[in-house]
């Protein structure tokens, strides 16, 4: 999984079966939210720079029979793309298509695509637009689906099911990953349940759509397992809510209390970004770049902030997607190196390289100070 240094991808392609590159930082520098002005000729020159680095990489991949994942993240779009297309689904798609067009010209077809965002509405809208754009340009590459930085616990599972399920029930997607801020093995059972319930949830989605009245989806199930039921409801209603065909959700199931079902409905509405009834957390699954105890930190921040309804907090392992995925968050906690943390207020880094032992308290103090000023 290569970021920032294209040469690393060249070396990895000699030894690995598949290499992921990120169009947002493969050639372009990491985003700093700076607006850039280009003439059409200057912009074309930027595309030539991509081709100059990508074609040799593709040739190495051909030689070693290495596959490539072009993995676009909403959080790491380049300033070049953002300046020309805005922070939009169209910009995310174009970031991918610039690379796909080169692959097609070079007759390199061992390509998988992923378009990920922590915002389910952005993720679903963008993947649909990508499919439409690829069809228009006669491209047919497999799609990997995921809601990035989905979080952990029930909320992370529900957010993943809303986004991934919306597309799976439309017949879009070839592979999936449920990204949870938990031990990696916790992701597989959830992903398996999503895949195993595609057909059932597609039928349930039709019934849910037929039920819409007074801006409300009413869905009835008889599942006795709580997680199975919550994933099925999220999958079946995700697209309907993301498309704003309804703004309210009623869930009926004789095996669970009304209070618990209302809580599930609220969680699904929040995952679809319709109604916010609790603090919103964006947190990544962690990887080799995460140099602090992510799970413990999330638990501590949640324990101290869960009463702040509507507040959005990003808790990120590193800078690759951190500042970008948190661009619409109120506050951010981002790994900055071994034992070091940087804190953000919206897009602004307000404290750099804080010792990890102090960082959670510093974040809470920042939030408290800002709230006192309001």
State the predicted function of each range.
Residues 37-50, 54, 82-308, 312-315:
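Catalytic alpha/beta core domains of metabolic enzymes, predominantly
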Residues 16-33, 170-185, 245-258, 335-349:
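Glycine-rich phosphate-binding active-site loops on the catalytic face of alpha/beta enzymes
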Residues 1, 70, 113, 167, ...:
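Conserved, mostly hydrophobic/aromatic
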Residues 338-341, 349-372:
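Beta-strand/loop-dominated core regions that host nucleotide or nucleotide-derived cofactor-binding catalytic loops
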Residues 320-328, 337:
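A C-terminal functional module that forms or caps the active site or interfaces directly
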Residues 2-98, 223:
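Active-site beta->alpha loop and helix N-cap motifs at the rims of alpha/beta catalytic domains
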């Amino acid at each position: 999984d290569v970021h920032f240094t294209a040469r690393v991808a060249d070396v990895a392609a000699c030894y690995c079966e598949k290499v992921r590159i990120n169009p947002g930082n493969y050639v372009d520098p990491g985003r700093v939210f700076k607006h850039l002005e280009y003439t059409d000729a200057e912009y074309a020159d930027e595309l030539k720079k991509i081709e100059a680095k990508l074609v040799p990489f593709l040739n190495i991949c051909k030689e070693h029979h290495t596959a490539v994942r072009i993995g676009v993240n909403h959080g790491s779009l380049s300033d070049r793309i953002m300046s020309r297309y805005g922070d939009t689904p169209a910009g995310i798609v174009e970031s991918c298509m610039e690379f796909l067009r080169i692959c097609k010209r070079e007759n390199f077809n061992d390509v998988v695509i992923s378009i990920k965002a922590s915002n389910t509405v952005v993720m679903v809208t963008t993947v649909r637009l990508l499919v439409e754009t690829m069809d228009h340009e006669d491209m047919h590459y497999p799609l990997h689906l995921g809601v990035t930085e989905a979080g952990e616990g029930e909320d992370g599972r529900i957010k993943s099911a809303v986004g991934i399920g919306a597309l799976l029930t439309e017949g879009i997607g070839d592979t999936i990953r449920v990204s949870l801020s938990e031990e990696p093995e916790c992701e597989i059972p959830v992903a398996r349940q999503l895949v195993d319930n595609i057909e059932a949830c597609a039928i349930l989605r039709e019934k849910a759509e037929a039920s819409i009245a007074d801006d409300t989806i009413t869905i009835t199930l008889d599942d006795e397992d709580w997680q199975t039921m919550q994933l099925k409801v999220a999958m079946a209603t995700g697209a309907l809510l993301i498309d704003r065909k309804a703004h309210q959700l009623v869930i009926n199931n004789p095996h669970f209390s009304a209070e618990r079902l209302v809580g599930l409905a609220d969680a699904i509405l929040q995952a679809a970004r319709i109604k916010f009834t609790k603090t919103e957390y964006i947190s990544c699954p962690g990887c080799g770049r995460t140099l602090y105890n992510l799970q413990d930190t999330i638990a501590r921040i949640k324990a101290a902030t869960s009463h702040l309804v509507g507040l959005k907090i990003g808790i990120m392992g590193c800078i690759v997607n951190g500042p970008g995925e948190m661009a619409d968050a109120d506050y951010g906690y981002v790994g900055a190196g071994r034992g070091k943390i940087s804190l953000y207020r919206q897009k602004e880094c307000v404290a750099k390289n804080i010792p990890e032992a102090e960082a959670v308290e510093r974040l809470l103090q920042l939030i408290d100070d800002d709230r006192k000023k309001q």
